[in-house]
Design a protein with these regions (language model features):
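A polyanion-binding, active-site-adjacent surface
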Residues: 1-185
Length: 185
């Protein structure tokens, strides 16, 4: 896929039929935030609330993410946020490999346009698609990886923290490391 301006990429994404997720979506959840952000957060895919509103991270997990951002002095409008897949998988299941492969060119294009210095992978699915297909979130989260001049880190997805609040301490350590890296840019 050739590098497209963000608006053209969005329009192409709206008309996408590259996988079966297009058959069940209410809305494409493209991404949002500052196009000039130094930091980009990438999640797995839209949930029910996101599919209904067409915006990323607006449900309970999004509310928790907002609090986590505020704790390191960031606001949603300061960052750019997107997902690996742009359409909701049925019953919030993990996206299938063919769905990820259909959508990943859109995300790569978004990353190229936003040109962040830091990418934060929220959860295992994002980390596997961006860092390493064998990524294990519990063993490998909180470490920095360098790719083409971009610092990449993975932490728990906010939905995982809602299911298992015991992981919040580790996520907080990750967010402090993110804040430190951002402050030193």
């Amino acid at each position: 896929m050739a590098l497209l301006p963000l608006k053209e990429l969005y329009m192409e994404c709206l008309n996408c039929k590259k996988c079966n997720l297009s058959n069940t979506r209410n809305n494409v959840v493209f991404g949002e935030g500052s196009y000039k952000s130094k930091i980009m957060f990438i999640g797995e895919g839209p949930g029910k609330d996101e599919d209904l509103q067409g915006k990323p991270f607006v449900g309970r997990a999004g509310q928790l993410l907002n609090k986590m951002l505020e704790a390191i002095n960031l606001k949603r409008e300061d960052i750019y946020i997107a997902n690996i897949v742009k359409c909701r998988p049925p019953n919030n299941r993990v996206p299938l490999e063919e769905e990820i492969q259909a959508c990943i060119p859109y995300l790569r294009n978004q990353v190229a346009i936003i040109s962040p210095k830091i990418i934060v992978c929220l959860g295992s699915t994002a980390a596997k698609a961006i860092i390493d297909k064998n990524f294990k979130i519990t063993a490998m989260r909180g470490r920095w990886y360098e790719r083409k001049g971009v610092s990449i880190i993975a932490t728990y997805h906010p939905a995982a923290l809602l299911r298992d609040p015991g992981k919040k301490t580790e996520a907080w350590e990750d967010f402090k490391a993110i804040k430190e890296k951002l402050d030193n840019l």
